[in-house]
Amino acid sequence: MIIYLHGFDSTSPGNHEKVLQLQFIDPDVRFINYSTLHPKHDMQHLLKEVHKAIEQSNDPEPIICGVGLGGYWSERIGFLCGIKQVIFNPNLHPENNMAGRIDRPEEYEDIATKCVEQFRMKNKGRCLVILSRDDEIHDNSKTAQALENYYEVVWDDKETHKFKKISQHLQKMKAFKENN
């Protein structure tokens, strides 16, 4: 099973395309929608829905993946639910760059302080990071610096922030999912 979390642009047709692409490596892809506007509510909702999806699945190695803001949530929710994560161009600091776009960006900072201390150290090796060299939203060299000591980082030379096409990374994702 692959759980897919959309980014800030939840209505983008690209989300459906990504789900279809993910079905090439696992027919059981679950799209979980969330508001993107209310971080604390989103965290509760995502924890509940991801936990429910894991319980309903008989997959011994489910993964969660997301793009942008969905990558932020995938890393945290996946860690808290004990499943591996694949994150594309994650938004590591929505508390800094979502001001004016969501109601309470400061809630992300609150979530970060309440999350398990040094969670990346405890999550080491359980997340695959795929970054675009041409991300027009975030400086992915900083993202790589923040994550490379904990996770494998793969660079993509073609895609932009929204990562419209993920098919070139599907076999890497499949191997990561199946490798204990």
Swiss-Prot record:
Domain of life: Bacteria
Classification via Gene3D superfamilies: alpha/beta hydrolase
InterPro entries: AB_hydrolase_fold, UPF0227, UPF0227/Esterase_YqiA
Coiled coil: none
PANTHER family linked to this entry: ESTERASE YQIA-RELATED, UPF0227 PROTEIN YCFP
Similarity annotation: Belongs to the UPF0227 family.
Protein name: UPF0227 protein VV1_2072
Organism field: Vibrio vulnificus (strain CMCP6)
Lineage, highest ranks first: Bacteria, Pseudomonadati, Pseudomonadota, Gammaproteobacteria, Vibrionales
